[in-house]
Design a protein with these regions (language model features):
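Nucleotide/phosphate-binding catalytic cleft detector across ATP-hydrolyzing
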Residues: 2-116, 127-198
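Acidic, divalent-metal-coordinating active-site segment for phosphoryl/phosphodiester hydrolysis
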Residues: 122-125
Length: 198
C-alpha cells in the first residue's frame, strides 16, 4: 500500500565501538574518526535518495562511555547527523517490534513458550514469552565485544578462552535459570544478533 515501507537498498558498515568502550570506558579518536567518516557517507547516500526523515541510534557502546553527551555533540557537528542514545529497554523494544512486524508467524510462535535471545556487543537480553505475553526479560552482560575485551584484559591464551567464556556464561545462565526459567520448558528460540551472522 501507499504507507508501506519498502527496502530500496541495504548498506551496512561495521565499526566495533564497543571494544574501546568496554575496555577503557572511552571511544578512541581513531574509531571516532571512522564513525564520523562512515556517517558522512551515509548522509551523502540519504541526500542522493532525497531522504526527508531518518533515525540514527546509539546503543551501549556510546551509552556506556564516560562522555556520552560530548560524543553526541561531536558526531552532530562533524556529520550533521543527530544520534539518539537508546536505553537498553528502548533498544530491545525496537528489536522486538521488528520481529513482531513479521505478523502472524511471530504471534503463532510466541503462543508457545518462546525465548528471544538478543545478542549484542555489550549484553545478551533473554525475553520469555508464553501465551502471547512477555513473561520476563533479563539482561546478561555477556555481549560478544564485552567478553572479547574481558579475555584480552585477562591475557587469556587461545586454549583458556573457551574455558573462561564457558565459566562466565555458565555462572550467569545458571543464576538466570534458577531465578527466571525455573521449570519452564522452552519450545522455540528466536535469535536476534549483530555478531553471529555475516
Amino acid at each position: 500500500g501507499k504507507n508501506t515501507m519498502r527496502e530500496i537498498d541495504c548498506i551496512r558498515q561495521r565499526i566495533d565501538l564497543g571494544s574501546d568502550t568496554y575496555a577503557n570506558g572511552k571511544i578512541s579518536n581513531e574509531k571516532m574518526d571512522d564513525l564520523c567518516h562512515t556517517l558522512k557517507e551515509f548522509a551523502q547516500i540519504m541526500e542522493s535518495y532525497k531522504v526527508i526523515a531518518y533515525k540514527a541510534y546509539g546503543t551501549s557502546a556510546i551509552r556506556e562511555t564516560e562522555n556520552t553527551l560530548i560524543l553526541q555533540d561531536q558526531i552532530e557537528q562533524r556529520t550533521g547527523i543527530r544520534v539518539e542514545i537508546l536505553s537498553n529497554s528502548e533498544q530491545r523494544f525496537l528489536d522486538y517490534k521488528s520481529i513482531a512486524s513479521k505478523g502472524e508467524t511471530f504471534r503463532r510462535i510466541i503462543e508457545e513458550k518462546t525465548a528471544i535471545l538478543d545478542i549484542g556487543g555489550g549484553s545478551i537480553q533473554i525475553s520469555l514469552f508464553d501465551k502471547d505475553t512477555l513473561v520476563s526479560t533479563q539482561n546478561l552482560r555477556l555481549g560478544v565485544l564485552r567478553l572479547q575485551e574481558l579475555l584480552n584484559h585477562l591475557n587469556a591464551g587461545s586454549t583458556q578462552m573457551e574455558q573462561l567464556v564457558d565459566e562466565l556464561a555458565t555462572a550467569q545462565l545458571d543464576d538466570y535459570k534458577k531465578l527466571y526459567l525455573k521449570d519452564r520448558e522452552i519450545k522455540n528460540i528466536i535469535i536476534v544478533d549483530d555478531y553471529l551472522t555475516t
